[in-house]
């Protein structure tokens, strides 16, 4: 299926065209093409080994492609030395100089070096920006992981680059610090308006922070779109499986928009793929548990197997009648349970809305 890019018609700041990178017989990046608008925040999302870090390294000039082209602000930088590309970069490991103070780390790339007063002013400005005022004289060893990453971000922004590259900058931090820095990073990027590309394998991180998400798999771009497009309208089976939780139902085609799952015939709001064997997909939060039975399209009975409280959502495991061997996962808000207490063994009506069902060719693997 062709990758979807809903913003491809807008003006671009960075573009890559048909980039390829091979390491012997292994293809790390295969014909990757992408366009990024000025001021946009884009996340490269995918499993380990999918090519996302390779793509970022090629853009940074830390590696060279075997084929393809990279353009930044209209300038071909495919073979340009890293120092002559207009970007700042933050690594997962911080990469701070342990023998230099915070101020000297941040000012390292500033020129001319003799302008000490100007550099000191810029350092103070950046430390205020990243929430570390008064830290100029400290050394990296005196800072927490989150503070070190703030210093690394300040250093990357010191030269006011047109492009900010982030290589999994939050993955080494604990969950609470990571969530806080994620919010700060998003707010800072919005205020500065700097074009940003971030590599991550954390789908929640990508969906919450990015203007657009680029999902990668096996060296190829599977889909490009807004977080909502990626989550609600996955362009391929891989994207649907990788981003978010899902129910997978093996089905057989019955007509243009009908498919049979066991003894149940379900309607879909869109045409089915041209295949007899199908897999239907629906998110757990889209499964509707009804308070009482009433005959309706895509509505069936299911036995409650398990009820698990999850804070904002309560998770259910349901065994639908007429679908032997299948378990449906549903997520409902606790307020619904206040009106309709559920216990294992109870039979409840369940609706699988036609608008939320999607079909992919082939039998379910999960």
Swiss-Prot record:
<dbReference type="GO" id="GO:0015419">
    <property type="term" value="F:ABC-type sulfate transporter activity"/>
</dbReference>
<dbReference type="InterPro" id="IPR050093">
    <property type="entry name" value="ABC_SmlMolc_Importer"/>
</dbReference>
<dbReference type="InterPro" id="IPR017666">
    <property type="entry name" value="AminoethylPonate_ABC_PhnT2"/>
</dbReference>
<dbReference type="Pfam" id="PF08402">
    <property type="entry name" value="TOBE_2"/>
</dbReference>
<dbReference type="InterPro" id="IPR003439">
    <property type="entry name" value="ABC_transporter-like_ATP-bd"/>
</dbReference>
<dbReference type="GO" id="GO:0005524">
    <property type="term" value="F:ATP binding"/>
</dbReference>
<keyword id="KW-1278">Translocase</keyword>
<dbReference type="InterPro" id="IPR008995">
    <property type="entry name" value="Mo/tungstate-bd_C_term_dom"/>
</dbReference>
<comment type="function">
    <text>Part of the ABC transporter complex CysAWTP involved in sulfate/thiosulfate import. Responsible for energy coupling to the transport system.</text>
</comment>
<comment type="subunit">
    <text>The complex is composed of two ATP-binding proteins (CysA), two transmembrane proteins (CysT and CysW) and a solute-binding protein (CysP).</text>
</comment>
<dbReference type="InterPro" id="IPR013611">
    <property type="entry name" value="Transp-assoc_OB_typ2"/>
</dbReference>
<keyword id="KW-0067">ATP-binding</keyword>
<protein>
    <recommendedName>
        <fullName>Sulfate/thiosulfate import ATP-binding protein CysA 2</fullName>
        <ecNumber>7.3.2.3</ecNumber>
    </recommendedName>
</protein>
<dbReference type="GO" id="GO:0043190">
    <property type="term" value="C:ATP-binding cassette (ABC) transporter complex"/>
</dbReference>
<dbReference type="InterPro" id="IPR017871">
    <property type="entry name" value="ABC_transporter-like_CS"/>
</dbReference>
<dbReference type="GO" id="GO:0016887">
    <property type="term" value="F:ATP hydrolysis activity"/>
</dbReference>
<keyword id="KW-1003">Cell membrane</keyword>
<keyword id="KW-0813">Transport</keyword>
<dbReference type="InterPro" id="IPR003593">
    <property type="entry name" value="AAA+_ATPase"/>
</dbReference>
<keyword id="KW-0764">Sulfate transport</keyword>
<keyword id="KW-0997">Cell inner membrane</keyword>
<comment type="similarity">
    <text>Belongs to the ABC transporter superfamily. Sulfate/tungstate importer (TC 3.A.1.6) family.</text>
</comment>
<dbReference type="GO" id="GO:0102025">
    <property type="term" value="F:ABC-type thiosulfate transporter activity"/>
</dbReference>
<feature type="binding site">
    <location>
        <begin position="46"/>
        <end position="53"/>
    </location>
    <ligand>
        <name>ATP</name>
    </ligand>
</feature>
<dbReference type="InterPro" id="IPR027417">
    <property type="entry name" value="P-loop_NTPase"/>
</dbReference>
<dbReference type="Pfam" id="PF00005">
    <property type="entry name" value="ABC_tran"/>
</dbReference>
<keyword id="KW-0547">Nucleotide-binding</keyword>
<keyword id="KW-0472">Membrane</keyword>
<feature type="domain" description="ABC transporter">
    <location>
        <begin position="14"/>
        <end position="243"/>
    </location>
</feature>
């Amino acid at each position: 299926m062709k990758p979807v890019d809903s913003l491809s018609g807008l003006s671009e700041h960075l573009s890559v065209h048909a980039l390829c990178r091979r390491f012997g017989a292994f293809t790390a990046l295969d014909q990757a093409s992408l366009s990024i608008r000025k001021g946009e925040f884009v996340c490269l999302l995918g499993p380990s080994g999918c090519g996302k870090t390779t793509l970022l390294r090629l853009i940074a000039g830390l590696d060279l492609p075997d084929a393809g082209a990279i353009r930044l602000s209209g300038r071909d930088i495919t073979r340009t030395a890293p120092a002559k590309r207009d970007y700042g970069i933050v690594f997962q490991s911080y990469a701070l100089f342990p023998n230099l103070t915070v101020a000297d780390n941040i000012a390292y790339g500033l020129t001319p070096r003799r302008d000490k007063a100007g550099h000191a002013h810029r350092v103070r400005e950046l430390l205020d920006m990243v929430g570390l005022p008064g830290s100029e004289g400290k050394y990296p060893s005196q800072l927490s992981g989150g503070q070190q990453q703030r210093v690394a971000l300040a250093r990357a922004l010191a030269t006011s680059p047109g492009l900010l590259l982030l290589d999994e900058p939050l993955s080494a931090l604990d969950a609470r610090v990571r969530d806080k820095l994620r919010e700060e990073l998003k707010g800072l990027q919005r205020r500065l308006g700097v074009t940003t590309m971030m590599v991550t394998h954390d789908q929640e991180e990508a969906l919450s922070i990015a203007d657009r998400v680029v999902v990668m798999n096996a060296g190829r771009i599977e889909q490009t779109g807004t977080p909502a497009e990626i989550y609600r309208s996955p362009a391929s089976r891989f994207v649907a499986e990788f981003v978010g939780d899902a129910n997978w139902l093996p089905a057989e085609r019955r007509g243009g928009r009908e498919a049979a799952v066991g003894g149940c015939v379900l309607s879909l709001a869109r045409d089915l793929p041209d295949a007899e064997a199908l897999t239907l997909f629906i998110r757990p939060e889209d499964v509707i548990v009804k308070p009482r039975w009433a005959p309706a399209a895509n509505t069936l009975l299911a036995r409650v197997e398990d009820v698990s409280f999850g804070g904002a959502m309560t998770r259910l495991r349901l065994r639908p009648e007429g679908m032997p061997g299948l378990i449906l996962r549903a997520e409902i808000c606790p307020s619904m349970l206040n009106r309709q207490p559920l216990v294992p063994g109870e039979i409840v009506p369940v609706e699988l809305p036609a608008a939320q069902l999607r079909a992919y060719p082939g039998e379910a693997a999960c």
